[in-house]
């Protein structure tokens, strides 16, 4: 059920193929059409060390800093909420709230079973309209030279007073997952002597091959355990040596070091200097 509507005067104009001046002209036309509405610009920002929001209307600039676990999506929604909480000023009854976050507007536009908590707060604040206040919402493209939007963006990125805002479950979950993966990667980065580290230096998941037997063979090559190189362990025999090199059989030696196969390396890879990551890494050959 649709419960919230917004304007998009830039519909049909894709950012990749539209000059900034076109967006500025479209925005100017929208402002002339809704000239009695006080423009209110909102923006949210998130970097590695800062999460904040900015609100600009009349001669007022508001900005606040949030907990680092908050997502940029939540920051964009909170900027809209802050705007609604502050725009009621004497002698003005018509406001147009501009945001460059289409995802925030869409989340307000469509009713879902699990709404973001800030979405609920914003929708409740819309009851202001019943008091004779007319508030409309509009999307505006970011970073195209629209002054109010640029000011809100600068305010959102600036250091400011901290606002105590609860962090929603999804943001906490994502932040915790990112922290765990970061610690995992830092720990794995120290395992430089682990033979798997040179093949898979990142803890990110690799796409699986569609054929299972190919996955099995590739996994055996990556860990260096194959029937050819390790059969002697099952049979209780001595480790066999490569006749020409006088070294034990190993996947690494056969694929990387053995001079007998140099001509194959040059033929297929145009070089005799390869690594296991080149051959059986994320994009295996």
Where are these regions (language model features)?
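RNase H-like, metal-dependent ribonuclease domains
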Residues: 1-257, 264-285
């Amino acid at each position: 059920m649709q419960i919230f509507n917004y304007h998009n005067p830039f519909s049909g104009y894709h950012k990749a193929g539209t000059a900034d001046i076109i967006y500025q002209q479209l925005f100017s036309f929208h402002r002339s059409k809704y000239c009695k509405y006080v423009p209110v610009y909102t923006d949210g920002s998130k970097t590695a060390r800062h999460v904040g929001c900015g609100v600009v209307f009349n001669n007022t600039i508001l900005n606040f800093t949030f907990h680092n676990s908050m997502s940029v999506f939540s920051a964009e929604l909170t900027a809209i909420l802050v705007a609604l909480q502050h725009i009621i000023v004497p002698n003005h009854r018509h406001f147009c709230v501009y945001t460059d976050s289409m995802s925030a507007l869409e989340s307000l536009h469509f009713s879902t079973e699990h709404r973001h908590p800030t979405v609920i707060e914003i929708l409740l604040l819309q009851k202001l309209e019943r008091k004779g206040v007319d508030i409309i919402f509009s999307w505006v493209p970011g970073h195209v030279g629209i002054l109010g939007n640029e000011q809100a963006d600068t305010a959102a990125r600036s250091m400011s007073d901290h606002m105590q805002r609860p962090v929603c479950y999804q943001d906490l979950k994502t932040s915790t997952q990112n922290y765990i993966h970061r610690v995992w990667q830092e720990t794995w980065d120290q395992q430089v002597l682990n033979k798997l580290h040179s093949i898979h230096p990142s803890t990110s998941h690799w796409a699986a091959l569609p054929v299972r037997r190919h996955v099995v063979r590739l996994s055996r090559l990556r860990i260096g355990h194959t029937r050819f190189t390790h059969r002697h362990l099952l049979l209780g025999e001595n480790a066999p040596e490569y006749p020409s090199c006088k070294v034990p059989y190993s996947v690494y030696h056969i694929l990387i070091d053995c001079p007998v196969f140099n001509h194959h390396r040059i033929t297929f890879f145009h070089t005799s200097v390869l690594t296991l990551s080149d051959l059986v890494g994320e994009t295996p050959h």
